[in-house]
Amino acid sequence: MAKPLTDQEKRRQISIRGIVGVENVAELKKGFNRHLHFTLVKDRNVATPRDYYFALAHTVRDHLVGRWIRTQQHYYDKCPKRVYYLSLEFYMGRTLQNTMINLGLQNACDEAIYQLGLDMEELEEIEEDAGLGNGGLGRLAACFLDSMATLGLAAYGYGIRYEYGIFNQKIREGWQVEEADDWLRHGNPWEKARPEFMLPVHFYGRVEHTQTGTKWVDTQVVLALPYDTPVPGYMNNTVNTMRLWSARAPNDFNLQDFNVGDYIQAVLDRNLAENISRVLYPNDNFFEGKELRLKQEYFVVAATLQDVIRRFKASKFGSKDGMGTVFDAFPDQVAIQLNDTHPALAIPELMRIFVDIEKLPWAKAWEITKKTFAYTNHTVLPEALERWPVELVEKLLPRHLEIIYEINQKHLDRIVALFPKDISRMRRMSLIEEEGGKRINMAHLCIVGCHAVNGVAKIHSDIVKTQVFKDFSELEPDKFQNKTNGITPRRWLLLCNPGLADLIAEKIGEDYVKDLSQLTKLHSFVSDDIFLREIAKVKQENKLKFSQFLEKEYKVKINPSSMFDVHVKRIHEYKRQLLNCLHVITMYNRIKKDPKKFFVPRTVIIGGKAAPGYHMAKMIIKLITSVAEVVNNDPMVGSKLKVIFLENYRVSLAEKVIPATDLSEQISTAGTEASGTGNMKFMLNGALTIGTMDGANVEMAEEAGEENLFIFGMRVDDVAALDKKGYEAKEYYEALPELKLVIDQIDNGFFSPNQPDLFKDIINMLFYHDRFKVFADYEAYVKCQEKVSQLYMNQKAWNTMVLKNIAASGKFSSDRTIKEYAKDIWNMEPSDLKISLSNESSNGVSANGK
């Protein structure tokens, strides 16, 4: 007799991840075996699991390439406006499963792999994360690429193909240790090298001014070799391109006079040129003016703009008169979005191309340049803003410095004309800062050189307008906009939480995957006890799966019915992992004080990387791991409280932990987190949020109702008032006995008995240099956590609140964000045309998604 189907299997029969056709499965198996034999040159006797992963990846890629080519043909034929998303980071994660979902192949692939006697999950786990980003900024770029393809926009992501991505984090004896992320060592089946589009990038040299114009001469040349990765939209046959540049030394690099020099040394020196794309810089929100980093920023910009102009000239809009290309139509055909200030050199570089090479008059070139560029600001922390030393720019990019000076002069002339007596305003608004050595303020360059500037959440955009760039918004108020960040529901629901995705589809249909606002329909089920129980059941399945993963990876046995309290993001003082840690110790002390008292069991999971040079962040990790050591080994605590530090947090680990989370920690000091996107991922996956009124938390509370989040602590105005009054940490320490006990324990070596003064730097910072005011929010945070525990005991009330949050999360789709960018900044129209494959029609496009 057949076994009864599990809930998961029943749901898969009506899954939104594609219908399994017998032909599909047979074709996939055939493709798999073909690649195993002809691409990998293996048979089943000698093939390894990695070979099977590669065979599957190539098979899936076969289904991409036709769509990829048709998409590019369609863009060439129709000449739509194109948007270029310039970012030094693209935190893509893994590609295989996301591609299967977006092509509607997942169930067919699952079935084919099952019939081949292999384990799909095992194959998916073999793929390396493409960790070409630090955190939110790079992951946002990845979500945006998915949305741009899904919305049918002619979009390109441009960045650097780092040989080493964000470091792998190991925890040894409680300390973070960094290891290189050699993510390409086994090869990457998703990329295609395009040596035919290799381009020269110039550095150093000098500037010659002649009668005929200005020339940048005697430069060192590095070649930029593009690698293309396909970016499939969801079920629309659109496949866009992410083009990442790799640095190569030219053949004659340092060899011009090797006869009199050292040929071997000259060849070895080629590494110097190729170092440009060697490694991603870890971000600690603290700007350091490193020459190699500036080279990276110019490298991506120079290669990309040559590519953009080549593509424009090849289109019907790149018309020529007797003098050369006419660029009047350029801003109507090209939009370039700068993801933070890292690609800001694109502004003087485009001016250099227009003025020096294409011989446009300055005023004309400037008008076109401004209309082309837009800038997204991602941080309000002043120490994080890029300010490059003038002498470094002068050495590396002498012509660009001249252009920046010229831009600044014209900008300041305008300020003087408008505010003739306001010298301090002129100094504040200059692109060149004079204090402590001349520096170029890259954010000011972006604001002056772009037609639109946006923040990434309402509260952040307000701070940008009224505080950080107040002078500029007074000058051009219409330039400043808000575009609240979003996340792609394909990866952050369908891929990572298929149980919940299918459950939602049962109730409201499948269209929500491309229109997340439809989740509001779930509001009508908040009183449906059966549905609430099903949602709770999916959460429990995810928790069970994750607890098995934790036991396997960390050898810690946890209680899967405990509350999973999760805090995963970069380790930084402003994100306040320390506040969470103080609460953990407080809970520990309460259990020890009264072991018989009922305590709502919790598993506190903290994860994230500290930048290698950021001492305080590394100390915070050591404190968390030391506290975990004590708590997890105390028999009196047992399964009531467990603390896990998640090693090497990355996209593929986020996909596991987020669906299993009950409580999401979003506790930055109000006014410091620009937006956050982790908060949105947790909300969509049925976790409740404990957080401050900061970043996108504010809008999450607006959407779901503040009563459906656990909001605590100071608001932005309270923080400002406390700054004005003067923050005295000691006052809180003296007034709050539980806080005093916790701090004394850390200070006297309770968590580091072999090194009692191990955490003196943390204690010293908390008392005397804490810009993020941990003590000021401690009491409110602990009280709010008590409310969380209380509600968790009432599972029906908890699950009702969960459903209200899921139903309110539709705003936070990156599809909505990208539609706003397209309408308000890029002047582009999303398209719901489904590009037909060549055998479907002659004109290459079918309407109505057919």
From Swiss-Prot:
- In the record, N6-acetyllysine modifications are located at K470, K796
| UniProt-listed GO biological process terms | glucose homeostasis; glycogen catabolic process; glycogen metabolic process; necroptotic process; response to bacterium
Marked site, May be involved in allosteric control, at: Y156
In its UniProt record, a GO molecular function of this protein is: glycogen phosphorylase activity
Modification(s) after translation: Acetylation, which is up-regulated by glucose and insulin and down-regulated by glucagon, inhibits the glycogen phosphorylase activity by promoting PPP1R3B-mediated recruitment of phosphatase PP1 and Ser-15 dephosphorylation.
Residues reported to bind AMP: D43, R44, N45, Y76, R310
Does the UniProt entry include the keyword RNA-binding?
no
Where is the site Involved in the association of subunits? C109, C143
| Major place of residence | cytoplasm
Q: Enumerate the InterPro entries for this protein.
A: Glycg_phsphrylas, Glyco_trans_35, Pyridoxal_P_attach_site
Give the N-acetylalanine positions (modified residues): A2
The record's catalysed reaction(s) read: [(1->4)-alpha-D-glucosyl](n) + phosphate = [(1->4)-alpha-D-glucosyl](n-1) + alpha-D-glucose 1-phosphate
Modification type N6-(pyridoxal phosphate)lysine: residues: K681
The subcellular localization recorded is: Cytoplasm, Cytosol
Regulation of catalytic or functional activity: Allosterically regulated through the non-covalent binding of metabolites, being activated by AMP and inhibited by ATP, ADP, and glucose-6-phosphate. The activity is also controlled by post-translational modifications including phosphorylation and acetylation.
Q: Which residues carry this modification: Phosphoserine?
A: S15, S524, S527, S561, S639
Keywords, comma-separated and alphabetical: Acetylation, Allosteric enzyme, Carbohydrate metabolism, Cytoplasm, Glycogen metabolism, Glycosyltransferase, Nucleotide-binding, Phosphoprotein, Pyridoxal phosphate, Transferase
- Give residue numbers for the modification (N6-succinyllysine): K364
Q: Which PANTHER family match?
A: GLYCOGEN PHOSPHORYLASE (PTHR11468), GLYCOGEN PHOSPHORYLASE, LIVER FORM (PTHR11468:SF3)
Question: How does this chain assemble?
Answer: Homodimer; enzymatically active. Interacts with PPP1R3B; recruits the phosphatase PP1 which dephosphorylates and inactivates PYGL/glycogen phosphorylase.
Q: Which family does it belong to?
A: Belongs to the glycogen phosphorylase family.
What name does UniProt use for this protein?
Glycogen phosphorylase, liver form
What is the protein's species of origin? Mus musculus (Mouse)
The gene that this protein is the product of is Pygl
